[in-house]
């Protein structure tokens, strides 16, 4: 993939902090993904956009990131998807040593985050990064099996949807999957079963430490890890179909879903699958508007410290804008809206 200037869509007047990324994504899609930065800079510090890279990482950069994560524990041990925790400001000093405007902005952003969290865990930066960071946080914090995973209808979804929407057979199976799409119903059902089983097992553990150890182990098993991502992508598609059908019937839907289907590349769920979800893990990650869909799929509020937006209203972005009060919260750190890391160790004097 070529690497150039990361698109910086126009700001939408009146957008709330959490809605802006979805609006940005829609604006970018309408402009062919090449919209240039046009918002007026704030008088105070903002991270510069002119030298930022494409939304998704080049293959050589992904491989370099993988090698770094292997070296965290040693080449002879299992490959890590989520590195061990380290002091968040030590990590910042290691990653951002220069005195450029962007480095200064990042340091200030990390300093702000360090008021809430003392440590960070680096997440492997491939095109599953957003899914990996979100799912790892959600499962490691599990204190019970969510009602949506207990629903007996869940395992019937693959056959039900694929029989109703023939275009789902265009599904592109993820990495580490054997077999062909003729086995698609069984493959997705196996992934959903694994997600339920692993989530339930983690939720039954008595201590947070035990859950963390088990979750670390799960995310070193690539076959199981990638199967979980397939399940989550299918849940995202299911929610997209529900939202699209509601919109077509004139029902009230979350604003992000209007923007999701306003893109030239995802006018309907079929296009969303072909042009976006099928690319996740292969050639692209999740776009900003799709982070809302991810939140709805796993029914978790996703709070992100967007360090490139330091000193703006978008520094802390919440997906979705107005989440149900009973949704658990996962917190992530993003340096550039494509690579997510995990903050850990909430400061004793701080509460979210």
Curated annotation (Swiss-Prot):
<dbReference type="GO" id="GO:0071797">
    <property type="term" value="C:LUBAC complex"/>
</dbReference>
<dbReference type="Pfam" id="PF16218">
    <property type="entry name" value="Peptidase_C101"/>
</dbReference>
<dbReference type="GO" id="GO:0008234">
    <property type="term" value="F:cysteine-type peptidase activity"/>
</dbReference>
<dbReference type="GO" id="GO:0010803">
    <property type="term" value="P:regulation of tumor necrosis factor-mediated signaling pathway"/>
</dbReference>
<feature type="modified residue" description="Phosphotyrosine">
    <location>
        <position position="56"/>
    </location>
</feature>
<comment type="function">
    <text>Deubiquitinase that specifically removes linear ('Met-1'-linked) polyubiquitin chains to substrates and acts as a regulator of angiogenesis and innate immune response. Required during angiogenesis, craniofacial and neuronal development by regulating the canonical Wnt signaling together with the LUBAC complex. Acts as a negative regulator of NF-kappa-B by regulating the activity of the LUBAC complex.</text>
</comment>
<feature type="active site">
    <location>
        <position position="126"/>
    </location>
</feature>
<feature type="region of interest" description="Linear diubiquitin binding">
    <location>
        <begin position="95"/>
        <end position="96"/>
    </location>
</feature>
<feature type="domain" description="OTU">
    <location>
        <begin position="118"/>
        <end position="346"/>
    </location>
</feature>
<feature type="active site" description="Nucleophile">
    <location>
        <position position="129"/>
    </location>
</feature>
<feature type="active site">
    <location>
        <position position="339"/>
    </location>
</feature>
<keyword id="KW-0597">Phosphoprotein</keyword>
<dbReference type="GO" id="GO:0050728">
    <property type="term" value="P:negative regulation of inflammatory response"/>
</dbReference>
<dbReference type="GO" id="GO:0060828">
    <property type="term" value="P:regulation of canonical Wnt signaling pathway"/>
</dbReference>
<feature type="site" description="Linear diubiquitin binding">
    <location>
        <position position="314"/>
    </location>
</feature>
<keyword id="KW-0007">Acetylation</keyword>
<keyword id="KW-0225">Disease variant</keyword>
<comment type="similarity">
    <text>Belongs to the peptidase C65 family. Otulin subfamily.</text>
</comment>
<dbReference type="GO" id="GO:0016055">
    <property type="term" value="P:Wnt signaling pathway"/>
</dbReference>
<keyword id="KW-0833">Ubl conjugation pathway</keyword>
<dbReference type="GO" id="GO:0045087">
    <property type="term" value="P:innate immune response"/>
</dbReference>
<keyword id="KW-0879">Wnt signaling pathway</keyword>
<dbReference type="GO" id="GO:0004843">
    <property type="term" value="F:cysteine-type deubiquitinase activity"/>
</dbReference>
<feature type="short sequence motif" description="PIM motif">
    <location>
        <begin position="52"/>
        <end position="57"/>
    </location>
</feature>
<feature type="region of interest" description="Disordered">
    <location>
        <begin position="1"/>
        <end position="48"/>
    </location>
</feature>
<keyword id="KW-0399">Innate immunity</keyword>
<dbReference type="InterPro" id="IPR023237">
    <property type="entry name" value="Otulin"/>
</dbReference>
<keyword id="KW-0037">Angiogenesis</keyword>
<dbReference type="GO" id="GO:0002040">
    <property type="term" value="P:sprouting angiogenesis"/>
</dbReference>
<dbReference type="GO" id="GO:0006508">
    <property type="term" value="P:proteolysis"/>
</dbReference>
<keyword id="KW-0391">Immunity</keyword>
<feature type="region of interest" description="Linear diubiquitin binding">
    <location>
        <begin position="336"/>
        <end position="338"/>
    </location>
</feature>
<dbReference type="GO" id="GO:0005829">
    <property type="term" value="C:cytosol"/>
</dbReference>
<comment type="subunit">
    <text>Interacts (via the PUB domain) with RNF31 (via the PIM motif); the interaction is direct. Interacts with DVL2.</text>
</comment>
<keyword id="KW-0645">Protease</keyword>
<feature type="region of interest" description="Linear diubiquitin binding">
    <location>
        <begin position="124"/>
        <end position="126"/>
    </location>
</feature>
<dbReference type="GO" id="GO:0070431">
    <property type="term" value="P:nucleotide-binding oligomerization domain containing 2 signaling pathway"/>
</dbReference>
<dbReference type="GO" id="GO:0032088">
    <property type="term" value="P:negative regulation of NF-kappaB transcription factor activity"/>
</dbReference>
<dbReference type="GO" id="GO:1990108">
    <property type="term" value="P:protein linear deubiquitination"/>
</dbReference>
<keyword id="KW-0378">Hydrolase</keyword>
<feature type="region of interest" description="Linear diubiquitin binding">
    <location>
        <begin position="283"/>
        <end position="289"/>
    </location>
</feature>
<dbReference type="InterPro" id="IPR023235">
    <property type="entry name" value="FAM105"/>
</dbReference>
